[in-house]
From Swiss-Prot:
InterPro entries: Chaperonin_GroES, Chaperonin_GroES_sf, Chaprnonin_Cpn10_CS, GroES-like_sf. Heptamer of 7 subunits arranged in a ring. Interacts with the chaperonin GroEL. The lineage of its organism: Bacteria, Pseudomonadati, Pseudomonadota, Gammaproteobacteria, Pseudomonadales. The keyword tRNA processing does not apply. The keyword Cell inner membrane does not apply. PROSITE patterns: CHAPERONINS_CPN10. It comes from the Bacteria. One of its GO terms (biological process) is chaperone cofactor-dependent protein refolding. It is found in: Cytoplasm. One of its GO terms (molecular function) is ATP binding. Its main location: cytoplasm. This is Co-chaperonin GroES. It comes from Pseudomonas fluorescens (strain ATCC BAA-477 / NRRL B-23932 / Pf-5). Keywords: Chaperone, Cytoplasm. GO terms for cellular component: cytoplasm.
């Protein structure tokens, strides 16, 4: 199954959780924080402006992005994988390089 977001929404595959702290302590799955970064796997067609024009999104498939800890509260399971669906304005930055 393929997920196609509408308008200014994006679908993000969350990065793997960190299982160790910087000090080397191994965290159980329940104690590890969910990462606030991921890779865009699908984008919508764009935001519809008041005048009817469609503004294309500033992000594209394959971009690595950072989002807030409470962003992407819409989790969808597709082919056994949890994906986040969020509006483009919930993305804080694109990771370059």
């Amino acid at each position: 199954m393929k997920l196609r977001p509408l308008h200014d929404r994006v679908v993000i595959r969350r990065s793997e959780e960190e299982s160790k702290t910087a000090g080397g302590i191994v965290l159980p799955g329940s104690a590890a924080e969910k990462p606030n970064r991921g890779e865009i796997v699908a984008v919508g067609t764009g935001r519809v402006l008041d005048n009817g024009e469609v503004r294309a999104l500033a992000v594209k498939v394959g971009d690595k992005v950072v989002f807030g800890p409470y962003s992407g509260s819409n989790t969808v399971k597709v082919d056994g994988e949890d994906l986040l669906v969020m509006a483009e304005n919930e993305i804080l930055a694109v990771i370059e390089g």
